[in-house]
Structures are given as structure tokens and as C-alpha cells.
Amino acid sequence: MTLTRRSLLACSASFAAAAPFAARAETKPAIHVMKDPNCGCCSAWIEILENEGFAVTTERSLGTLLIKYKQDNGIPQNMASCHTGKIEGYMIEGHVPPADIRKLLAERPDAIGLAVPGMPYGSPGMGPESERDAYDVYLIGRDGSSEVFTHYEAA
């Protein structure tokens, strides 16, 4: 087979057109997490996110600074947990499963983000999923309201 200038240009154009799609497919969703440096469950949740293909950066924050960060970013007090993430403009509060974060990013609702209030046993980073308690992941509205985004039954 003879490689002509025309076929070389056509091939080059095909690769150039496909390059942005290939780069996008390899990009990991980036989440920045504010957490108490002494909290082991936060580190366990971060490890789960990394294992699920998220690029995670962390920042240590204590007490009132972490509470202020949550308030400044629209997390209602009744939705609070031990760590707060920010991904593509959405807030992620507490032990939210990676699948729910991906669903949020795919659906792109007009909302502040997701929250798992408290620290339910068996949620990601809080013990074995096979022994989990029932819990809900909430979608936090821009007006501070919340609704169930996903319900997880007890195992």
C-alpha cells in the first residue's frame, strides 16, 4: 500500500479530531476535600474515592473554620457531617457514595450538592457496606431545602 499525501492528511485530521475526546475520557473528576486531620473515616472515604477514579486533593481544617466553610458554601447545619468536598461547582457533604457523585455530575441539577448527614454506619468510609444501616443521600437545593436523592436500605 502506498501512503499518499492525501491519505496522510486525512489520517492526521482524524487523529486531531479524536484527541480531545480521548483526553476527556482519561480525565479523572477532581474533588477538593476539607477535613479534620484527626478523622480516620474522612481518610477512608477519600481512599474509596481515589479507588473509584477520582483525583482527590485535601486541605486540613479544624472546628470553627470547617463549620464556616460549610456555611459559606450553603451546607445547612442539619446536613452537616465530618468533611466537605467541592467538585465541579457542587458541594459534597459527608460520606456520599462515589456512584451518587457521578450521578450528580451526569444529571447536573440546579442545586448546592449532596449530603449524607451524620456518619451512618456502613456508608463509604464508615465500616463494611455488607453491614450498613439504612441511610439517605440528600440533594441540597439552592434555597437550603433538601430531598432524598438516593435511599440505601440496611444490609
Task: Tell me what each language-model feature is.
Residues 48-57:
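Conserved helix-turn-beta segment immediately C-terminal to the redox Cys motif
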Residues 56-67, 87:
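Thiol-based oxidoreductase modules, predominantly thioredoxin-like and allied folds used
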Residues 29-44:
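Local sequence-structure signature of Cys/Sec-based thiol-disulfide redox active-site neighborhoods
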Residues 30-31, 55, 89-91:
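Short active-site oxyanion
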Residues 45, 62-65, 97-101:
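Stable alpha-helical elements in mature extracytoplasmic
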Residues 71-155:
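Thiol/selenol-based redox catalytic cores and closely related redox-interacting motifs
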Residues 34-36, 61, 95, 117:
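Active-site-proximal beta-strand/loop segments in catalytic clefts of secreted hydrolases
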Residues 1-3, 7-25:
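N-terminal export signals
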